[in-house]
From Swiss-Prot:
GO terms for molecular function: magnesium ion binding; nucleic acid binding; RNA-DNA hybrid ribonuclease activity. Binds 1 Mg(2+) ion per subunit. May bind a second metal ion at a regulatory site, or after substrate binding. Endonuclease that specifically degrades the RNA of RNA-DNA hybrids. It comes from the Bacteria. InterPro entries: RNase_H, RNaseH-like_sf, RNaseH_domain, RNaseH_sf, RNaseHI. Its EC number is 3.1.26.4. This is Ribonuclease H.
């Protein structure tokens, strides 16, 4: 069975500040690069946006996806926190509204539509896919900050 391999990264210059996200998708010999930029955003918003944009371009729901991110916020959120947030009406353990709720809700829908296995990868560790996603995010930020 073929798998789609996805690497995502998000970054921010200032927090909040100018942010960018990058995605590198691989499926067999095919690869696709995506990137985007946003003003007045946060690093966590860009990390979430990268994963959302990656999953939005996948049209088939029956292909396994390995998604790699260096964001522990995204990994822990999607694999642990989100179940409790939903059970508590999108509130945290402290009964406060979940930050970035719009992004988390969109990611939750996409995650449930696809067969995603989530992987954490250490950032800036020489991982080719993570380095590519990071470079795409930085190129996006370069476009707006120059």
């Amino acid at each position: 069975m073929n798998k789609i391999i996805i690497y995502t990264d998000g970054g921010c210059r200032g927090n909040p500040g100018i942010g960018g996200w990058g995605v590198w998708l691989k499926y067999g010999d095919y690869d696709k690069k995506l990137q985007g930029v946003q003003q007045d955003t946060t690093n966590n918003q860009m990390e979430l946006t990268a994963t959302i944009k990656a999953l939005e371009v996948i049209k088939s729901n029956d292909i396994a996806i390995d998604l790699f991110t260096d964001s522990k916020y995204v990994i822990t959120g999607i694999s642990e926190w989100i179940k409790n947030w939903k059970a508590k009406g999108w509130k945290t353990a402290n009964k406060k509204p979940v930050k970035n709720i719009d992004l988390w809700q969109r990611l939750d829908v996409l995650n449930n539509q696809h067969n995603v296995t989530w992987h954490w990868v250490k950032g800036h560790s020489g991982d080719k896919g993570n380095d590519m996603a990071d470079a795409l995010a930085n190129l996006a930020m370069d476009k707006i900050s120059t």
